[in-house]
């Protein structure tokens, strides 16, 4: 009797572990029971349940003496519940996986009979490595809300976070109106669902709990404090200002590359929905006119095909644009195929209608081979031995060049005294020279001396004739000739 009760209670314990949350004392009691009653030759069956927790069915043998009074009462209570469920005819289905608790040589059998598997190859050395599932922190099967905490500290997308959080708070309050009739409970909910500066704002602000919607007051205050939008005092003016900014941005938007169509449409659509619905048709026409290449054709199609509510649909206009874009892509593919088309295949369709006409021919295409501009490896050059004078070439001697005398420099030669270092008007000998008198007369007439008009080396040659020296030289030459004749005689 004790064995059957123990088996059923243990089975119900591991089966209900994924559905009912046991207390810590009950859980510890069952674990201690299993550790004391198990022998070394016992086998544990692991079972998988619909929940995420692993459930284990243990087959144990024990005696009546090993069960205390407190433990038997607890086991009998669980056994009664298991008997009631077994009478109903509903039994859980387990996927049995047998494994040796002590890591022995027992190997599970294969269904196909091919041979032993390698499931139990890894042996457990110490009993401390035994696996026992822990108590689950949350009740399995319980649905949890997907709403998180609102934390907008140092966030860039604050408006999106506030809008999502406000939508979920409003959904909770509207679906549970009986629990949130008092503004205090709503503020308590909003305070516990925020953190950081948003929580400090809700906690430290005095809210008007008598008039108006408390959720709307909190959202307007967040818009004012964290986004800089004055929704608390003048909400209408802020919305009008947002509409004007959206209109200006839609006017400035440009699409230069058709490949960025998706990004352009997303930006344009986001700003268009900030305006009034009655102005949508005009903005859609403006959107189509901004698209290059296919914008005009898409605009004519939109005017003919749009009717009813589709006149206000930017998505319908974007659909037409994509259809026209796909047509152009197909046409470009056909043009690429036509370039590769062989004209010799035209005679297959019908007989030739040209007689005596010059046949069209095309030049053969020779593919230009690619030549590497660099080598894959660095060439190694042996360093040559230095030999002095082998490749020495003496420098050419260059003559002395005349110094160039630009205007304003005092390194030219004076034409009065023929000395470098000063001009003629500054010459110290100009008073005693005839050239100086000419210079003074020129200064009276308002004339200034200029540089020498001639460039290069200038030389003066003087040729003088002396008759007396020539006569003496001739006489000496005659005397010498007569003396030579006498000696010869």
Curated annotation (Swiss-Prot):
SUPFAM superfamilies: Retrovirus zinc finger-like domains (SSF57756). Keywords: Capsid protein, Host nucleus, Metal-binding, T=7 icosahedral capsid protein, Viral penetration into host nucleus, Virion, Virus entry into host cell, Zinc, Zinc-finger. InterPro entries: Caulimo_coat (IPR001988), Znf_CCHC (IPR001878), Znf_CCHC_sf (IPR036875). It is found in: Virion; Host nucleus. One of its GO terms (biological process) is viral penetration into host nucleus. A motif (Nuclear localization signal) lies at residues 122-125. Residues 135-144 have a biased composition (Polar residues). A zinc finger (CCHC-type) spans 412-429. One of its GO terms (molecular function) is structural molecule activity. GO terms for cellular component: host cell; host cell nucleus; T=7 icosahedral viral capsid. Residues 95-110 have a biased composition (Basic and acidic residues). Residues 79-144, 467-489 are annotated as: Disordered. Residues 81-94 have a biased composition (Acidic residues). Belongs to the caulimoviridae capsid protein family. Self assembles to form an icosahedral capsid, about 50 nm in diameter, nm, composed of 420 subunits of the viral capsid protein. The capsid encapsulates the genomic dsDNA. Following virus entry into host cell, provides nuclear import of the viral genome. Virus particles do not enter the nucleus, but dock at the nuclear membrane through the interaction with host importins. Interacts (via nuclear localization signal) with host importin alpha. This is Capsid protein. It comes from Cauliflower mosaic virus (strain Strasbourg) (CaMV).
């Amino acid at each position: 009797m004790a064995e059957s009760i123990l088996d059923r209670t243990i089975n119900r314990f591991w089966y209900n572990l994924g559905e009912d949350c046991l207390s810590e004392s009950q859980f510890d009691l069952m674990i201690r029971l299993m550790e004391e009653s198990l022998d070394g030759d016992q086998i544990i069956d692991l079972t998988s349940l619909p929940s995420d927790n692993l459930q284990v069915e243990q087959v144990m043998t024990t005696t009546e003496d090993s069960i205390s009074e407190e433990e038997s009462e607890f086991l009998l209570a669980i056994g009664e519940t298991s008997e009631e469920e077994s009478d109903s005819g509903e039994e859980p289905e387990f996927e049995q996986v047998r494994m040796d608790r002590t890591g022995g040589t027992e190997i599970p059998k294969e269904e196909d009979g091919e041979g032993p598997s390698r499931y139990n190859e890894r042996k457990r050395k110490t009993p401390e490595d035994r696996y026992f599932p822990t108590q689950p922190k949350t009740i399995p099967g319980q649905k949890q809300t997907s709403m998180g905490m609102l934390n907008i500290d140092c966030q860039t997308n604050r408006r999106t976070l506030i809008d999502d959080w406000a939508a979920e708070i409003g959904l909770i309050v509207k679906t549970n109106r009986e629990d949130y009739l008092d503004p205090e409970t709503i503020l308590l909910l909003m305070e516990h669902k925020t953190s950081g500066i948003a929580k400090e704002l809700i906690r430290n602000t005095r809210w008007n709990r008598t008039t108006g919607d408390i959720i709307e007051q909190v959202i307007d205050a967040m818009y004012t404090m964290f986004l800089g939008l004055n929704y608390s005092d003048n909400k209408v003016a802020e919305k009008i200002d947002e509409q004007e900014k959206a209109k200006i941005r839609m006017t400035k938007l440009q699409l230069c590359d058709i490949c960025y169509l998706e990004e352009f449409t997303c930006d344009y659509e986001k700003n268009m929905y900030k305006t009034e619905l009655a102005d949508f048709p005009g903005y859609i026409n403006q959107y189509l006119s901004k698209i290059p290449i296919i914008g005009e054709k898409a605009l004519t199609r939109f005017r003919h095909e749009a009717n009813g509510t589709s006149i206000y649909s930017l998505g319908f206009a974007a659909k037409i644009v994509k259809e026209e874009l796909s047509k152009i892509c197909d046409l470009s593919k056909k043009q690429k195929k036509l370039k590769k088309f062989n004209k010799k295949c035209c005679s297959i369709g019908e007989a030739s209608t040209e007689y005596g006409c010059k046949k069209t021919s095309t030049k053969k295409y020779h593919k230009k081979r690619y030549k590497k501009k660099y080598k894959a490896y660095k060439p190694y050059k042996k360093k040559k031995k230095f030999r002095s004078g082998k490749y020495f070439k003496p420098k050419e001697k260059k003559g002395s060049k005349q110094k160039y005398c630009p205007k304003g420099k005092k390194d030219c030669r004076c034409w009065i005294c023929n000395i470098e270092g000063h001009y003629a008007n500054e010459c110290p000998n100009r008073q005693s020279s005839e050239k100086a008198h000419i210079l003074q007369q020129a200064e009276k007439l308002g004339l200034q001396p200029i540089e020498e008009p001639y460039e290069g080396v200038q030389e003066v040659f003087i040729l003088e004739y002396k008759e007396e020296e020539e006569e003496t030289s001739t006489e000496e030459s005659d005397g010498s000739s007569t003396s030579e004749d006498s000696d010869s005689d």
